[in-house]
A protein has these predicted regions:
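Transmembrane beta-strand segments that form the barrel wall of outer-membrane beta-barrel proteins
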Residues: 25-29, 36, 40, 64-71, ...
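Membrane-embedded beta-strand positions in outer-membrane beta-barrel channels/transporters
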Residues: 10-12, 52-54, 95-98, 136-140, ...
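Surface-exposed extracellular loop regions of Gram-negative outer-membrane beta-barrel proteins
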Residues: 21-27, 132-173, 283-284, 289-296
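Outer-membrane beta-barrel "beta-signal"
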Residues: 314-321
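Outer-membrane beta-barrel translocator domains and adjoining extracellular loop/strand segments
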Residues: 35-42, 75-86, 121-134, 162-171, ...
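Outer membrane beta-barrel
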Residues: 1-75, 96, 100-104, 109, ...
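Extracellular/periplasmic loop regions
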Residues: 127, 149-153, 157, 162-246, ...
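Internal metal/ion-chelating core segments
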Residues: 57, 61-152
């Protein structure tokens, strides 16, 4: 409602045209691949949703989606066309094309994504507004065979940001997990998101857009679930080693170690941000009932204090059930 006490999370209609084509219109979740760029984040009350038209084609080996979205809210500034990034409508328009291929003959799957995002900025006093267009394009690939589960992604961004700066940014990720047996699995991963050091004519910090950020970069949500401080946009290099132990069909646990550093070299600061350890245990009590608990702690550096705030000398931890 107008007082912000009630919000519709999801409401859409879907029409199927024959066996392979469909159209879906309304407020809906957009979740693709490993959710780096578009994810179904649902940690807060409202969740993440998009008012969009999704046109699609699907057969046993191919999926193709075209997503078209436009936002207009009369209660925002300049007659509903100036969007505050902290609000519920961070873009004015969006066009996304996604293609996924699943092979019957090899253990590889692959996806391609292209997104054109119209971000609006302006001056409420002069009632002038401008739409800046940011393009994101990339691929996501998976391989599953003989105990190996490997996935990787690469995305590149170009266009302009809200400040009308030319953008040239990228992110790359690689994760490899190997099941030693039915009980033990080891995993290693690396995520690199380019950052901006302020010494280039192009803005080089990658925008993570609408992904499920809690899924990556450590369970304590220091990075990308919240903004960097003091105008910094240093990017991130996250290296992870982990192990999973399945005690039984109903109980499993994960232990992961992360080492974080900035991607860009910042003046008078070292790159190292700190280390984090995450532990989680899961118990399947019965069908549709699962109990999880976890504990995490972070040991930061002076650089962490500058770009994220806080005091690295104090103990930082988090436990939950």
């Amino acid at each position: 409602d107008k007082n912000g006490r009630f919000i519709m999370n999801e409401a859409w209609a879907k029409l199927n045209f024959g066996k392979n084509f469909f159209a879906q219109l309304g407020r809906q979740t957009l979740s693709y691949d490993d959710e780096r760029i578009l994810g179904g984040l649902d940690w807060n009350i409202a969740g993440r949703y998009h008012d969009a038209l999704k046109l699609g084609y699907a057969d046993p080996n191919n999926q193709l989606h075209l997503i078209l979205a436009f936002n207009q809210n009369d209660e925002t500034k300049i007659g509903g066309t100036y969007y505050v990034q902290a609000g519920a409508q961070p873009y004015k328009n969006m066009q996304t094309l996604w293609y996924h291929y699943k092979s019957d003959y090899t253990p590889f799957d692959a996806s391609l994504l292209f997104m054109n995002l119209g971000l609006e900025t302006g001056d409420a006093a002069t009632k002038e507004s401008h739409t800046r267009y940011l393009q994101t394009m990339g691929t996501y690939i998976t391989y599953k065979d003989n105990g190996w589960n490997v996935d990787g992604a690469f995305y590149y961004q170009m266009g302009k940001n809200l400040n009308a700066e030319k953008v040239s940014a990228f992110m790359a990720s690689l994760q490899a997990a190997y099941a030693i047996d039915k009980t033990w699995t080891v995993v290693a991963s690396a995520d690199y998101l380019s950052g901006d050091s302020g010494d280039s004519d192009k803005y080089k910090a990658f925008n993570v857009l609408y992904g499920t950020h809690h899924k990556f970069y450590g369970a304590m949500d220091y990075f990308y679930a919240s903004d960097f401080k003091n105008g910094y946009a240093p990017g991130l290099f996250d290296k992870r080693l982990g192990v999973r132990f399945c005690a039984s069909d109903k109980v499993d646990m994960d232990l992961n170690y992360h080492h974080f550093s900035t991607a860009a070299k910042l003046p008078n600061l070292k790159k190292a941000l700190g280390s984090e350890v995450d532990y989680q245990i899961n118990w399947s009590v019965m069908k549709d009932v699962k109990l999880s608990a976890g504990y995490s702690f972070m040991r930061g550096t002076e650089t962490m204090d500058v770009v994220k705030g806080g005091n690295h000398k104090s103990w930082q931890d988090w436990g939950w059930v």
